[in-house]
């Protein structure tokens, strides 16, 4: 799910969709309007799910999409080699979430963990 917003309303720490990938805004810089042009904004962001750096430059009146990112909690059912099986604590659905090697020692069956969900993708949120 996503909503449409103007670039002028965005701030650091909010989410934006760049190249069909939800990203978190790391920096935003506004330039002054020129003699014949509108004010521009440069947005630097990092992908939530792929950690790639992306940036866009556009007029501040441009409408862009902001994803709706949900932070949920789930219970670990089983830990595999490259993924973990979670059960959502609200609607009791079971999902497979990919994990990295450094996350494995922190996960064990029965433990409650937070995860992010947006645009059909899921990521563990271990801090």
Swiss-Prot record:
It comes from the Archaea. PROSITE patterns: IF5A_HYPUSINE. It is found in: Cytoplasm. The modification Hypusine is found at residue 35. Keywords: Cytoplasm, Hypusine, Initiation factor, Protein biosynthesis. One of its GO terms (biological process) is positive regulation of translational termination. One of its GO terms (molecular function) is translation initiation factor activity. Transmembrane segments: none annotated. It holds the Pfam family IF5A-like_N. The keyword DNA repair does not apply. GO terms for cellular component: cytoplasm. Functions by promoting the formation of the first peptide bond. PANTHER family: TRANSLATION INITIATION FACTOR 5A FAMILY MEMBER. Belongs to the eIF-5A family. HAMAP family: eIF_5A (MF_00085). This is Translation initiation factor 5A. It comes from Methanothrix thermoacetophila (strain DSM 6194 / JCM 14653 / NBRC 101360 / PT) (Methanosaeta thermophila). The gene is eIF5A.
């Amino acid at each position: 799910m996503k909503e449409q917003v103007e670039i002028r309303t965005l701030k650091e720490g909010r989410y934006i969709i760049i190249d069909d990938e939800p990203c978190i805004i790391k920096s935003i810089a506004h330039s002054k309007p020129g003699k014949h042009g509108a004010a521009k904004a440069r947005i630097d962001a990092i992908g939530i799910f792929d950690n790639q750096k992306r940036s866009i430059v556009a007029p501040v009146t441009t409408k862009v999409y902001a994803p709706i990112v949900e932070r949920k909690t789930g219970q670990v059912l089983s830990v595999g080699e490259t993924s973990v099986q979670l059960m959502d604590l609200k609607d009791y659905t079971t999902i497979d979430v990919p994990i990295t090697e450094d996350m494995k020692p922190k996960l064990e069956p029965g433990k409650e963990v937070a995860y992010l969900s947006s645009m059909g993708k899921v990521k563990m949120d271990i801090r």
